[in-house]
UniProtKB/Swiss-Prot annotation:
There is a cross-link at K234, K255, K290 (Glycyl lysine isopeptide (Lys-Gly) (interchain with G-Cter in ubiquitin)). One of its GO terms (cellular component) is proteasome regulatory particle, base subcomplex. Keywords: ATP-binding, Cytoplasm, Isopeptide bond, Lipoprotein, Myristate, Nucleotide-binding, Nucleus, Proteasome, Ubl conjugation. Its main location: cytoplasm. The keyword Cytoplasm applies. GO terms for molecular function: ATP binding; ATP hydrolysis activity; proteasome-activating activity. This is 26S proteasome regulatory subunit 4 homolog.
Amino acid sequence: MGQGVSSGQDKKKKKGSNQKPKYEPPVQSKFGRKKRKGGPATAEKLPNIYPSTRCKLKLLRMERIKDHLLLEEEFVSNSEILKPFEKKQEEEKKQLEEIRGNPLSIGTLEEIIDDDHAIVTSPTMPDYYVSILSFVDKELLEPGCSVLLHHKTMSIVGVLQDDADPMVSVMKMDKSPTESYSDIGGLESQIQEIKESVELPLTHPELYEEMGIKPPKGVILYGAPGTGKTLLAKAVANQTSATFLRIVGSELIQKYLGDGPRLCRQIFKVAGENAPSIVFIDEIDAIGTKRYDSNSGGEREIQRTMLELLNQLDGFDDRGDVKVIMATNKIETLDPALIRPGRIDRKILFENPDLSTKKKILGIHTSKMNLSEDVNLETLVTTKDDLSGADIQAMCTEAGLLALRERRMQVTAEDFKQAKERVMKNKVEENLEGLYL
């Protein structure tokens, strides 16, 4: 029986030894493995195909490259061809400068005789019969233009295309003044008249066409000194977008014969080129006084300047959108031909301000001042005070200076009182001086 048990155990061992071991997958290594960049959709994409054989796409590409290479070759060849011409052109320019010489004189072309000769003049020399060199552009030559003259032979060697006088360029205001209608105390009727005469024709000319009337050509502002004539002109320049030329009458009086009328012509020429424009002539009585027989050359030159101004105001040439504003203190001394209707259609009078206007002017000038509590603006001006707008401004300035003298940052009523006494004293002295003139 013992043998039977042992034999049964041996059979079990043999059966166990004949069974195969269970498969176990190897451990995955963490090193040397590349991550897949795409998921399962990568296998569905079409591969990139590059034409490496003769096909239509490659042929088109090569033709485009050929076109670019041919264009580059043509550009290089043209550059090589143009080099001698550029060099020759520089040499010709040097020869031209040598022929012209240096320095050059400036003259005025009076008359063209023929294609090769002309008559020129200048304020510092007599008239000359000169030749016109062949390289001068004869299409630019016209009577009255400025030409360049050789300093020895006086031949015409060039034309000044921009023949505007530098003084005219200075007269043109690039920046509009800061004054506006709100800075003017009173003068409601004067502001309304100048708007109707100057502003409205430039901004809405169709209104005058519908009415069947021609807008005024110009206005003259006259009245006592310091009543706001120039201030109103500055406000007009601020309100409108038109070109504004400011001239003082004395600037039209020049030293040499003919310079005054020429400057007057150039002023209106520049105004016409930059239309719409406004020409403001301050102190017009400097050249616009009544004419009389005089043996003085200076007086006759002033009269010629005024005649040129009359021609520009009401000549054969239409001035278009060019308006004229004049200002003077003595309208009675002006020539009647200057201020007649047709040249100056409106005469606007500026009188000394009344009591309410004086208070408005005082309020404008004291609006930015640091006043003390004892200042009463209502009592500073009265009806009896013969004060103009400029006098009130001078009074406010003087009061501020008195406060600064005493190291104070506030202006008191006593400062205004002393300032008013000083201004009134100066006015009395000016009136007394006028009695002996």
